[in-house]
Each structure stands twice: as structure tokens, then as C-alpha cells.
Amino acid sequence: MQANLQWLDDPEVFRVNQLPAHSDHHYYHDTAEFKTGSRFIKSLNGAWRFNFAKTPAERPVDFYQPDFDATDFDTIQVPGHIELAGYGQIQYINTLYPWEGKIYRRPPYTLNQDQLTPGLFSDAADNTVGSYLKTFDLDDVFKGQRIIIQFQGVEEALYVWLNGHFIGYSEDSFTPSEFDLTPYIQDQGNVLAVRVYKHSTAAFIEDQDMFRFSGIFRDVNILAEPASHITDLDIRPVPNANLKSGELNITTKVTGEPATLALTVKDHDGRVLTSQTQTGSGSVTFDTMLFDQLHLWSPQTPYLYQLTIEVYDADHQLLEVVPYQFGFRTVELRDDKVIYVNNKRLVINGVNRHEWNAHTGRVISMADMRADIQTMLANNINADRTCHYPDQLPWYQLCDEAGIYLMAETNLESHGSWQKMGAIEPSYNVPGDNPHWPAAVIDRARSNYEWFKNHPSIIFWSLGNESYAGEDIAAMQAFYKEHDDSRLVHYEGVFYTPELKDRISDVESRMYEKPQNIVAYLEDNPTKPFLNCEYMHDMGNSLGGMQSYNDLIDKYPMYQGGFIWDFIDQALFVHDPITDQDVLRYGGDFDERHSDYAFSGNGLMFADRTPKPAMQEVKYYYGLHK
């Protein structure tokens, strides 16, 4: 198969040869590697050769050939944003598309059901291209194994070649993309070529309120899979009605040769609670395990059990060990139309959190994530909405450990396709009811679900943000409901299409609703509990009216709190030659047009993670309903 540039123009082509999404578990050769690191993973982070082209027509066409002369290529650091490495244009936008006012574009199939626009992005004057090259050798432990490459985050359209052979294509910027390199891998001198286009039809559904970057911005790893390997792990802990006992069901997917799987579950103190062995390949399900004296996971006591599965071959040689921490908890929407977690009414003291670092943009470190967790705990914040995309893989485990509720949002926002300068005009909204778009958005829901399905901190799946509503989003809801009965589904955009409210979202979710309007809803025999998915917009000297929302919690059981907009400013440090100091620059400070200017600064913290005075209000009022 050959790569096709026209895939950029077609919303029905969003993954080619990409491996199916799966759980986010790690695997090791033995338990000693839990501390030293897995021998089965090799990082490709660091310096890559790089070429920047302003348009697809200017790209180095055959750069992926092993004999290509790349002496005139630059060097770029991976992970990193192309724009922050000095190429292209830094641009912050809230709702419009980056090309608005310059190039006329409509999403394919929205003006005519037979309309596919050739060259929409593949021959565009504004579609910048990054071409990356990396050479690597295989470590001895990798030789003879199945070899997978994992890109944890690439904006926006990704083509991959190895040693001159086309490997695959993907689009979803914020969930991992994996491809099988085995047919073309060499022991030495491998040439990995990656081409990243800033825009494809995915741009119509990745219109989030943020700086618009491109490039390989999360980790890149080579993974070796042993002869028998657990590719997916599905953990289903279910407390009984009394919450004092429960059962555990676990299903694995084993690729390669049939294997013996030895499972052990320990409590927090390391005591073995249950163990069993199963043999097979493909789908391998363990017998239901019963638990007495159950410890529940909650924000107050985020109790996690330790699962370990050892994989043995036919000669009883240990091939790999898979550890995973999991928790028991319930999430219920009861007949009284109130949400309960572990039989207690849910109160969300939440924030919306973009991933951000003032020096590196959305390239964030473990230190950044741990600092954010500590800030949340110190200020009585008990919930995070991953606005408006899936976060880096470690974030979900950190929230499990800290007791932070998660609303795990799917990578979907099409704001510019239906709301223009504040006016509602959905004539070319996507995904909408368009039969050419549901596969792409359901795939994004599937990726979000599969990667993060085992985390007790997730109590809501979110279908995305500000994308209006239609049959395609209803299909996303149906996907989550079909695959998971242990969580609720959230979506705010159905507010604009009340005829779909019975089929989309378990909660009445609104943005920036006035307290008196919330009261009017709650006193009018509502059908769903109320949740502010965004409120208390913290721009400038804000949050002065937080008490008016907080007072609703004690008066109305169906009022379940909300998520403040937002956690951290999006701003970048730039060296000021006049003062010889690094200063924070916001939207519009990079000579970009158009821009939504300082609207990028709505955080409870400045971009350097210094808390603003408003954080004192948050700590006080959120502390009233821990």
C-alpha cells in the first residue's frame, strides 16, 4: 500500500494500518523491572532531523527513502511543537477555524451529500508540513520480537514510513497511535520517517479553545512484544449493593502463542486476596473473583488494589509481567434523578484543565502533572474535566492515586462549524447528522474508552465539547452505553437540540448559566440532574460570585456542582530584550491574525503555575462540601 495525500481531504479516512486502541497497561520482563524500567520499551524522544514546508507542494516528496540525502535538514527536539521550535506561526484562537477570513472552507459533505473537495487540505496554501527522520538500531532484547511504534500524541495528520515502506496513517491528535513495524524492521540502521500535516479534515473537529500547534508533542516509543503478549486488559470491579463485598471480572486479549496466565490480586498492604490461572490465546477470561470486607475508592480514601498477571510459555518460562492498580466504586443515577457515588450524593468541586507549560506549550512533564495534583488537593478541587481532549497517559493513574474524579472527554470540538461570532448557525455543522462523519467521531470515542476504561477516577465519559448535536453524537453516546454501564455520559451541546435530550447525556449540562436560571430549571420538574460543565470564567479579577452557585448545593439535591473555567492560563514565556527578562505572552502577542487575544488567560493559576488570588475563593467555597 502507498500513502495517499488525498486522505487529508476525506473525513472517512482517519486511520490506515493503525492498530486497535487498547488498555493503557505496562508490561515488564519480570517484577524487578517495576523499579528499573521495562526492557520492552525504547524511547525515540530526543533529536530528530527535520524539514519544514509552508505547503504540501513544497514538502520533500521522497524523504522517506533510505538513500535520501537529508544533509540540509535541521534538527528538532521530540516531543515538541513545530511552532515553538521557530517554524510557522504561533496562533491562539477560541472558536473560529485558523483559516477564517483568509480561505473559504466548508467541511466535506455538508453543503452537498456528494461533495468531496479535492485539494481542500492536500493542495492548500496554509497547510504547513513537518518531515521528521530518525535512525535507530534494535537492542538485543528486541531482535526477533514483534515491534510496535507508539506515538502518544501528534497534531494533526500523521504519515509513517520505515526503511522506505509505508507503515500507516492516523489523525486523532490526543490519543496514542500505534503501528506494526515488524515486516520491515532491521537489526541496525532503521530509518523512520514521519510526516505531519497541520491540517486535515480532522481540523474541523479539533477546534478547541487553545493555541493551534502542530508536530509530535508527546512521547514516541518502540515496543517489543514477547511471543505471547497481553495486548488488552479489561478490569470490571463491581461492588454489591451493600458496598461491603463485591466481585471482580477480568478479561484479557492475548496475541501470539497460547500462554498460561497466572493472576494475583493483593490489597494495599500487599496481602494476597485471590489468585488463579488460565491458559489460552485470543480472549482469555478469568473466573469471577469474590471479595469480602471491600475497600471502596473515593476522593476521601482512594483505595487501590494491586493486580499482577504473569505470562508463561509452554515451557513455563516467564515472558512478561503486567501490573495494574484498580478500585471498587459505584456511580448511579437513581430514580430521584440524583447522581450518587458509593451511595453518597455526588458534589463536583471541579476545574477544566488544559495541559500546559509556559515554556513548552502542551508538552508537559510528570513534574507538571504532579504539581497540578498537589494544587488541586491543596485547594479542595475534587474533579477535573480533561478539556477538551484525552490527556497524557500518566494523568489518569495520578488521579486514581490522589482521589480526583475525572470527566474523560473525547477529542471533539467543532465550534467553528455552527457558532459564528456568537450566533447559532448550524447549516454546515459537523458531525451533526451527516452520514460521512460518524465513523470518525465514534472512533475517537472508542479510543478514549479503550485506553482509559480501567481507571476508577473516571466517573463520566464526555462526548466532546461545543459541537452542537445530531445523530452522529447520539451514536457516540450509544457506543459508550453499549460498552460501559459503570459510568455516566456527559454532553453539553445537546442543550441546543432539545429533541435529542432523551438520547444524549445523562445530565443537564450548561455553560455559564446564571444561578437564577439554574433555580428555574431545578424547580420545574426536571428530568436530569444539573451540572455546570463550565462556569465562573476566571478571566481578570473574577470569581466574585462563587457563593451564589455554592448556595445551590444544600438547597437542591439535583444540583451537582460544576467545573470552573479554567485551571491554568495558556501563555508562553518570551524573552523581552528591553528588560532582559522572560515575560508571559498571551494570544495576539505573536503578531497572529486572527486571534482571540488575552482570552487565553482564564486560569486559577498563571501559566507558570503561580496561583491567582481567585484560588482563595475556590479553596474556601469548595472546602464547604468536601
Swiss-Prot record:
Active site annotation, chain numbering: E466 (proton donor), E534 (nucleophile)
Any single Gene Ontology cellular-component annotation: beta-galactosidase complex
Keyword Hydrolase: yes
Catalytic activity: Hydrolysis of terminal non-reducing beta-D-galactose residues in beta-D-galactosides
SUPFAM superfamilies: (Trans)glycosidases (SSF51445), beta-Galactosidase/glucuronidase domain (SSF49303), Galactose-binding domain-like (SSF49785)
Site description Has an effect on thermostability, residues in chain: L318
PROSITE patterns, per database record: GLYCOSYL_HYDROL_F2_1, GLYCOSYL_HYDROL_F2_2
Claim: Transcription regulation is one of the keywords in the record: no
EC number: 3.2.1.23
Biological process annotations from GO: lactose catabolic process
Family the entry assigns: Belongs to the glycosyl hydrolase 2 family.
Subunit structure: Heterodimer of a large (LacL) and a small subunit (LacM).
Protein name: Beta-galactosidase large subunit
Gene of this entry: lacL
